[in-house]
């Protein structure tokens, strides 16, 4: 009986040590590709000039689609570059739309953007089992706008104009800092992240405006 109990305790110790090892240093780590699709809440910041700031835009929404490549570095630490396409929108608050009206009755003014994102995340995953992993990650993200339109709609008016270039007042390129958490089960992935704009998106240095967002992602890892 004592020999049986001793064997059981040894076996439990081996299992416990193995589980702890996988939790922070899984020897089965390997590089892999993954696809990601996400829905996002766009959170434009205040427009500020000196000490004065105004909330000019409502929050909006958007989608993104792309891929990642997860590269193990040491233990369960990894680097994960990616490439994604996005489309998102946000609108001018109704109080400001009403203020701009003159002879034209406006229903709304919105910003619509399409472009590319290149995130480079650094993270660590905790492997609770062979199939269940919790990811914590953070890092920079380059965002380049291919197309951006200010759309005005109202009674007897429906028009769009570019927000970039000589006729626009916004910059195409932004750098954001992101952080988030993800849960992987087998090959499937779900994550939530926030990204905070670091660059002034107005091309007038006397005015400051930053774009932020929250993203909910689904994915598959190969």
Segments from the language model and where they lie:
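Cleavable N-terminal export/targeting peptides
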Residues: 1-29
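Local alpha-helix boundary/kink/capping signal
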Residues: 14-17, 87, 125, 146
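Short glycine/proline- and aromatic-enriched beta-strand/turn motifs that initiate or cap beta-hairpins
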Residues: 20-66
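Outer-envelope beta-barrel architecture signal
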Residues: 27-35, 75-79, 112-114, 130-134, ...
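Residues on the lipid-exposed face of transmembrane beta-strands in outer-membrane beta-barrel proteins
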Residues: 35-39, 63-73, 83-85, 118-124, ...
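Extracellular/periplasm-exposed beta-strand and loop segments of Gram-negative cell-envelope proteins
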Residues: 42-59, 88-115, 143-178, 200-211
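Structural signature of Gram-negative outer-membrane beta-barrels, strongest in the C-terminal barrel
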Residues: 109-125, 129-149
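C-terminal/domain-terminus segments
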Residues: 192-221
